[in-house]
Amino acid sequence: MAEQRIDTQYEDLLRHVLATGTPKSDRTGTGTRSVFGHQLRYDLSAGFPLVTTKRVHFKSIALELLWFLRGDGNVRWLQERGVTIWDEWADENGDLGPVYGVQWRSWPTPDGRHVDQIAQVLHTLRTDPDSRRMVVSAWNVAELDRMALAPCHAFFQFHVADGKLSCQLYQRSADLFLGVPFNIASYALLTHLVAAEVGLEVGDFVWTGGDVHVYDNHVEQVTEQLTRTPYPFPRLAVRPAGLFEHEYEDFEVLDYRHHPAIKAPVAV
């Protein structure tokens, strides 16, 4: 394990957006301060990047990722496990349309077949790890109108070097206070799981944001968060299992020292 240190990249980005962000209107009518184009890089051998300046609910993150990996587009599975983060967008039957997991596991083709992008990437990692085509996309232009919410974290790519698996995510729309801490931890967890599945160590997780914004009704909460001193990142322990067989109980976040949670409204 790399030497543990305090990582302030996320908090520094919050400060940057508050200080330099351009006022913009948005789909929700809330208003934001926005910057365009930013990148964060986390060495996953140095700790699990779970924000410490507020409590982040890891159980919701992990269960949402398992739900994605199931290829599910209905919130019932999440609700049965006490996760309600998608409820605002679901219809009366719990359906969200062909959102993230559906595209990951069952991207429709013009001839009526479906592509399992995750299985495809696993195959390439095993047979051609130097490939530059290990990309998974949730941004299916032909089906955006059927999705309850267009993908914010739109696509990700894997890269292998020196026996280590790295992952880069492109997030076209980044709610920096509420969403991004979830997304960073989710894809860091995914990188751990995929690395274990194909017999690699973890490398870096690279987060790339497009429209990176703080909502106007989150400024007070962000200001409070930035008065807090970050702690070292926790560590992640994962019980061995197949990628598609994992359950939440397989995951344990160790030594997660954090400040109290800060509540804020979700822009729907």
From Swiss-Prot:
Catalytic reaction list: dUMP + (6R)-5,10-methylene-5,6,7,8-tetrahydrofolate = 7,8-dihydrofolate + dTMP
Keywords: Cytoplasm, Methyltransferase, Nucleotide biosynthesis, Transferase
Active site: 152
GO CC, alphabetical: cytosol
Gene3D superfamilies in the cross-refs: Thymidylate synthase/dCMP hydroxymethylase domain (3.30.572.10)
Transmembrane segments: none
Enzyme Commission numbers on file: 2.1.1.45
Pathway: Pyrimidine metabolism; dTTP biosynthesis
Pfam families the UniProt entry points to: Thymidylat_synt
CDD domains in the cross-refs: TS_Pyrimidine_HMase
Domain of life: Bacteria
GO molecular function: thymidylate synthase activity
Compartment(s) where it occurs, according to its Swiss-Prot or TrEMBL record: Cytoplasm
Record-linked InterPro entries: Thymidate_synth/dCMP_Mease, Thymidate_synth/dCMP_Mease_dom, Thymidate_synth/dCMP_Mease_sf, Thymidylate_synthase, Thymidylate_synthase_AS
GO BP, sorted A to Z: dTMP biosynthetic process; dTTP biosynthetic process; methylation
Principal EC category: transferase
Assembly, per entry: Homodimer.
PANTHER family xrefs: THYMIDYLATE SYNTHASE, THYMIDYLATE SYNTHASE 1
Sequence similarity: Belongs to the thymidylate synthase family. Bacterial-type ThyA subfamily.
Known function: Catalyzes the reductive methylation of 2'-deoxyuridine-5'-monophosphate (dUMP) to 2'-deoxythymidine-5'-monophosphate (dTMP) while utilizing 5,10-methylenetetrahydrofolate (mTHF) as the methyl donor and reductant in the reaction, yielding dihydrofolate (DHF) as a by-product. This enzymatic reaction provides an intracellular de novo source of dTMP, an essential precursor for DNA biosynthesis.
Annotated protein name in UniProt: Thymidylate synthase
Gene this chain is encoded by: thyA
